[in-house]
Amino acid sequence: MSDTPSPWVARWAGAIAPYGRVLDLACGPGRHVRYLASRGLRVTAVDRDREALAQSRGIAAESIEADLEADAWPLPGRQFDAVVVTNYLWRPLLPAIAACVADGGLLLYETFALGQEHFGRPSNPHFLLRPGELLEAAQGLHVLAYEDGVAALPDRRVQRLAAWRPRGADPPRLQ
C-alpha cells in the first residue's frame, strides 16, 4: 500500500481549518493519518485492524479500534472539522458519517463505484456506490466538488466528494 495520500485528499487538505480535528474513518495503515498530522491537524484514526491501526499510533491524536460494520458507532455525538473516508463503504454508516462533520467542517469521501468490477476488486455491488449515491449521502451539506468516473494509476471506477457544512460564515478557501 502506498504511503502517498489520495490526490483527492491532498487537493482538499488545505481547506481544513488550521489545527483542526480530523476523523480518518477506516484508516487502514494510516497514509492519510500521517499526511494530515504532518500538516498540523489532530487526527482521530478509526479502523478494525489492530495491526494497521498500530502503524499510526503516536502520530494520530487518538486511535480507536472498532469494527464499523458489527459494533456500535464508536463516536456518538462527536464532530470533527473534517471527516476523511477513502476506499470504504458501509451504507448504514453514511448518515452518521455526515453527522460527524462540524459546522464549517468538510467531508472528503472517495470510494469505488459501480463499474469497478471491470477493473478488479472490489467487484461486489454491495461495496460499490450507485450513480449519485454519494451526493445523496451529503444532503444537508454544501457540495464543493463531485467527481464520478475512472481514476488512473491504477485505473479504478470512483466517486469523489468534497462537501462543507455551512455555519453562516464564508465557505472554505479553495486551493
Protein language model annotation of sequence segments:
Residues 152-175:
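Core SAM-dependent methyltransferase catalytic element
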Residues 89-100:
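A short, conserved alpha-helix within the catalytic core of class I
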